[in-house]
Amino acid sequence: MKNILYIGWIGFNNLGDELLWNIFRDTCAKYLDDNQVTLIPSLPGTDLKNFDRYDTIVLGGGSLLLPGYLQMLQNALNKGKSIAIWGSGLDWIEKSNLELLTNDQLSSLEQNFKQKDIDVLEDVIENALFVGVRGPLTKKAIEIMLGSEKAKKVKIIGDPALLLKKTSLNQPQENLIGINWGTTFNRLYGANEAILEEQLVEAAKQLINKGYKLFIYTMWPDDIPHCERLYNKINNPDNVILDKTLYTEQQLIDKLAKCKATINFKLHANLLSLTANVPAIALGYRFKVFDFVALVGLQHLIISTDSKQLTKEVLERIEIIEQTGPMIMEQYHTSQKTYMPLLESLFSQNYL
């Protein structure tokens, strides 16, 4: 019997992270014999300093390519354990560095990784069974730190949520726009959620004037008060639904399927929307969101949260969706077909 530890930010009721674990578990069940493999999720209370009972440690989906998690993987290697990275990515890279990176002008990531952290990253990548990262910006950042030769082993496999499928029958869309709102405790580009919220309120009012109804939804209990405040500021109960229910991924996909478009704060809200065949406007609040839209070729639908014209940009992107919605979904499904086998290759090609 092989014991596999899945490391993720799980056990905190955050749907985005929980669904990544669910996908890992379900993909294991599809390819691996459950009589030969035991999966252990890193729920709160799991001792991440003692890997004695595990054979393989998998760093799962999310933005977990951080010095602390990489140190855990190196510790596991030093204990003779196998390690793998599956769909994880970088985050926390400053906006100015994101722009330099995108334009191939960034030479260092010393704000995020000191030399000792880069040494750990190099050791982990060199000795891992499998290194699959979320998106092209993550891979580019690794190349800056290690050089392109040492980063060759790093594959862009996509966000594991690309494996999500809509299980229910199609239903007619309504004149409804979903809005996912919440908080990052001001740890976002622009560093000012209050200004962002005011611009979103104005965009919401203008969308109602255009004839849309709005559906405000949440991904995490901590986000509920922020959704309530947004609802109260829009102050139009006849045209706005506030849904505080914390759904499973499939339940939320079914809810979103009624929308014509969504505007999303949290990264995986975009993936749930796209799974529901609904084009998504991503509020680019940190590096990870830009990494994802670059992966699926939907950069024209992202709005940086430091934008001073967010209201105008939301309305422009809604117009793009009104005019080209089917093309947007075709682009997403093309990307999905590319990355699904790469995400499954960890399991299908016997790395585990």
Where do the protein language model's features map onto the residues?
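Active-site anion-handling motifs in enzyme catalytic cores
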Residues: 1-352
